[in-house]
Every structure is written in structure tokens, then in C-alpha cells.
Amino acid sequence: MKVKVKTKAVAYLRTSSATNGDGDSQVRQRAAIAAFSKTAGFELVDEFADVAVSGADPIESREGFAHLLDRIEGNGVRIVIIEDASRLARQLVTQELAILALIARGVRVLTANGDDLTDDSDPSRVMMRQIAGCVYRKIKPARSDGEVRPRWRAN
């Protein structure tokens, strides 16, 4: 019988405030990442987090992201899993710099819903990722105030 070896991956979490670090945000992110990893056949071997870090903060100023890069360069893990693109960044430039830094190291960035943020084989995918990166920071504050809701949610 052949034993299937799981591909190793690391998780990256980001919370925008210290209270989110202790609260639901990290729990929710971990659960989504763990569920996706199990379903997709990845073995999570480490976790990196930036707590109380704005999604607009530059990648190079994030301690958790720096540790993630060190780990990648040191052990050959080539998959980073995040809950969604907003956990990486909420500014387009920050998002794209993070993705390019990981692509340069031969790393794929996957979201917990299976999107490959590093897949640049289809220009339309790249365009949609970049549009989402521009739009999310405008939508999120409005959604927090209850002004904008997805059509499928009544309240």
C-alpha cells in the first residue's frame, strides 16, 4: 500500500487590532485555514501572525510576515494559506508587493476557499485579484457600519 505524503504548508493570519488577536478573528481564520488544509490535503507545519497590524501597513514592517519569509527560505515550504486576501492586505500596492515577494521565492498563496492568489497564468484572474484589492478597503468600513450588505444577506 502506497502512503500519500501531504504537501507541507504554513498559515498566515493578520488581525487589525489587539482585541481581534485575542478574540474571534484568529479563531475564525485558524478554523477556515485548517478546514481547507484538511480538504485539500495539506499538512500545516507552522503558523505566522501579525496581531494589531493594519492591512494597509507595508509588508516590510510586519514581523510575522518577516518570520514567514525566513521560514520559507529555510525549510522549503512552498504553500502559504490565508483565510482570504484581506488578511494579507487591504491596499492594492501592499497586496501586490506581498504576492510578488512570495512568487519570487517560488511560493503559492492560497485562500481558504481555494483561490490561488499567485496564479498569474490568466490575466483575467490577476485583474480580478487587483480589483478586489482596490475595492475591499472601500467596502469593509461601510459593511461594518451596516451600510452595505451582500444581496444574499437580509441583515
Language model features by range: what are they?
Residues 1-150:
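Short, structured surface patches at the beginning of a domain
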Residues 153-155:
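Charged, gly/pro-enriched flexible loop segments at helix/strand junctions
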